[in-house]
Amino acid sequence: MDKRVAEVAGAIVEAVRKILLDKRVTEAEYRAGVDYLTEVAQTRETALLLDVFLNSTIIEGKAQRSRTSAPAIQGPYFLEGAPVVEGVLKTYDTDDHKPLIIRGTVRSDTGELLAGAVIDVWHSTPDGLYSGIHDNIPVDYYRGKLVTDSQGNYRVRTTMPVPYQIPYEGPTGRLLGHLGSHTWRPAHVHFKVRKDGFEPLTTQYYFEGGKWVDDDCCHGVTPDLITPETIEDGVRVMTLDFVIEREQAEQRKSATETVA
């Protein structure tokens, strides 16, 4: 028996049983729920459904235990093979969207500036799409890896992302509609910060005053993830100083034993 599985899964089952009784769920309603979950699986929306309603809660718990910059949901559009870039993310020449500069530092949780940290950056096109995922957009557009310099600094120029809808024609979108919600996410930029010997940080940041910032369908926005509206020479600037924490000794030991 797996004690952790028994603890968590058992608590979930008991909570659901209590809701079924408290809300006097009928046999017909129960069967409708079974049919709904079957449809979710058949349309391959299981991950989408869980991410929309529950992922932010997992991140909230992680943030309460962390000494790092605020973590956030990763989303489905991270790709490991993004190229290393220096100063500029590739964007289409036809883009008429606003430029964006992202800059800052990476530090340890004890304040040490970290050279050689790798920062994956990815965000939507001005059409709300993602490279390597949608419409045959090349994987080296609108995403890339940055490497911090000897002083822990990084800087990259790109274009402003836009709000976009999650898949809305399937069962997840339908459930959001039943709940009186919508399927829009606010404009945001994703980051994954990594360095050997440190815990990876996955997060995303939003824009002050942006549409849907106060009503994200995935409940992923918290106040510390909203960047102020800073304009320099007519260009929006996002300044982010990331803090990552060292791996714990027991985690390093576990990883070594797994490899062995």
Curated annotation (Swiss-Prot):
Please name the InterPro entries in this protein's record. Answer: Catechol_dOase_N, Chlorcchol_dOase, Intradiol_dOase_C, Intradiol_dOase_core, Intradiol_RC_Dioxygenase
Question: Domain of life here?
Answer: Bacteria
Give one Pfam family: Dioxygenase_N
Q: In which pathway does it act?
A: Aromatic compound metabolism; 3-chlorocatechol degradation
Q: Could you cite one Gene Ontology molecular function of this protein? A: ferric iron binding
Q: Where does Fe cation bind?
A: 130, 164, 188, 190
Q: Provide the alphabetized UniProt keywords.
A: Aromatic hydrocarbons catabolism, Dioxygenase, Iron, Metal-binding, Oxidoreductase, Plasmid
For the keyword Cell cycle, the answer is no
* Signal peptide boundaries: none
Which note does the record give on the cofactor? Binds 1 Fe(3+) ion per subunit.
Spell out the reaction equation it catalyses. Answer: 3-chlorocatechol + O2 = (2E,4Z)-2-chloromuconate + 2 H(+); 3,5-dichlorocatechol + O2 = (2E,4E)-2,4-dichloromuconate + 2 H(+)
Q: Report any one BP term from Gene Ontology.
A: catabolic process
Cofactor annotation: Fe(3+)
- This enzyme's EC code(s): 1.13.11.-
Family stated for the protein in its record: Belongs to the intradiol ring-cleavage dioxygenase family.
Q: What does this protein do?
A: Preferentially converts 3-chlorocatechol and 3,5-dichlorocatechol as opposed to other chlorinated catechols. Retains diminished activity toward non-chlorinated substrates.
Full protein name? Chlorocatechol 1,2-dioxygenase
From which source organism is this entry? Pseudomonas putida
Q: Which gene encodes it?
A: clcA
